[in-house]
Each structure stands twice: as structure tokens, then as C-alpha cells.
């Protein structure tokens, strides 16, 4: 092709057999900081554990709209939420504190920012000891805010 020429690509019209059912399966959110899995306990506590067999780490990510998700524990039915102080907790019902902006970063990890506090850039994060990190203490570039969605089964 000569310089200055333009080309167009033909549209792909074939159907792909993608396993769409897998998108609906629960995930584990593996934190880059310390190797913890995000966990929502029955009492509403949010922390991390290294125990992959813990039932409280199985999470369902439910899209509200493009880039906006609810994160729900399949075991407790509670939704991940962030209050006005930036504390993570489990909520019995979905509300504005439960909606997070999901973003795939260049390093292939996901970050989750509270939609309610998006202008403050408060991320979901776990400390090196597995405790949840307050939103105001998180910022872009920290390992504490990087999560890798993994399948529940290791096969």
C-alpha cells in the first residue's frame, strides 16, 4: 500500500462460540498486596484471607451499566459497600454505597473505585496484613488496590 492510501477492513460476520455462561460464574478477587482474597463475612466485616477454600471469598460481580458493578458475596448475600468515611463493609441491600467503577489497568489487574466517592478517588483496597484499607488512604499506584478476578475452581 502506498503512503497516504487508506484501507478498510471487512466486518467479521461469523459467530463465535464464546462460553458466555462463564461470565456469570462467581469469581475470587485476588489482591496483589500480600496475596489475599477479598472476603465479606456474615457480620459485614470486609477483609482478606489466603485460604482459597473459604466460602466467603466467592463473589458475584453484577454489572449495573458499562464499567459499573455490584460485588456480592455468594455465601452471605451481602454487597460490598463503602461508607462516607471510606470504610468497606457488607450491606444486606444494594444502595449507592455498593456501586463501584471497575477498570482494567495496563498491568491486567482490576481496580474498583466507589462511584459515590469517585471524585475523591477512593479505591477498594487490602493492606499487607489482610485488613481492608480506608478509601482516603488509597491512591492510584498502590498494590493494595490491584485485584485479579480468578475463577473459583482452580482447574
Swiss-Prot record:
Keywords: Acetylation, Angiogenesis, Cytoplasm, Developmental protein, Differentiation, Growth factor, Heparin-binding, Mitogen, Nucleus, Phosphoprotein, Secreted. InterPro entries: Fibroblast_GF_fam, IL1/FGF. One of its GO terms (molecular function) is fibroblast growth factor receptor binding. One of its GO terms (cellular component) is extracellular region. The keyword rRNA processing does not apply. GO terms for biological process: activation of protein kinase B activity; angiogenesis; branch elongation involved in ureteric bud branching; cellular response to heat; epithelial cell proliferation; fibroblast growth factor receptor signaling pathway; lung development; mesonephric epithelium development. The modification N-acetylalanine is found at residue 2. A motif (Nuclear localization signal) lies at residues 24-27. The keyword Ribonucleoprotein does not apply. Coiled coil: none annotated. Heparin binds at residues 24-28, 113-116. PANTHER family: FIBROBLAST GROWTH FACTOR. Monomer. Homodimer. Interacts with FGFR1, FGFR2, FGFR3 and FGFR4. Affinity between fibroblast growth factors (FGFs) and their receptors is increased by heparan sulfate glycosaminoglycans that function as coreceptors. Found in a complex with FGFBP1, FGF1 and FGF2. Interacts with FGFBP1. Part of a Cu(2+)-dependent multiprotein aggregate containing FGF1, S100A13 and SYT1. Interacts with S100A13. Interacts with FGFBP1. Interacts with LRRC59. Interacts with CSNKA, CSNKB and FIBP. While binding with LRRC59, CSNKA and FIBP seem mutually exclusive, CSNKB and FIBP may cooperatively interact with FGF1. This is Fibroblast growth factor 1. It comes from Bos taurus (Bovine). The lineage of its organism: Eukaryota, Metazoa, Chordata, Craniata, Vertebrata.
Amino acid at each position: 500500500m502506498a503512503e497516504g492510501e487508506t484501507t478498510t477492513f471487512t466486518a467479521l460476520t461469523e459467530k463465535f462460540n464464546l462460553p458466555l455462561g462463564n461470565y456469570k460464574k462467581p469469581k475470587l478477587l485476588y489482591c496483589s498486596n500480600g496475596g489475599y482474597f477479598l472476603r465479606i463475612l456474615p457480620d459485614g466485616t470486609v477483609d482478606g484471607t489466603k485460604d482459597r477454600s473459604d466460602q466467603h471469598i466467592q463473589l458475584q460481580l453484577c454489572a449495573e451499566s458499562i464499567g459499573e458493578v455490584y460485588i456480592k458475596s455468594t455465601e452471605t448475600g451481602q454487597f460490598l459497600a463503602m461508607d462516607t468515611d471510606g470504610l468497606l463493609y457488607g450491606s444486606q441491600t444494594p444502595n449507592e454505597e455498593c456501586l463501584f467503577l471497575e477498570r482494567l489497568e495496563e498491568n491486567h489487574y482490576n481496580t474498583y473505585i466507589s462511584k459515590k466517592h469517585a471524585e475523591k478517588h477512593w479505591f477498594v483496597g487490602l493492606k499487607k496484613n489482610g485488613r481492608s484499607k480506608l478509601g482516603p488512604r488509597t491512591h492510584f499506584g498502590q498494590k493494595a488496590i490491584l485485584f485479579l478476578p480468578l475463577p473459583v475452581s482452580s482447574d
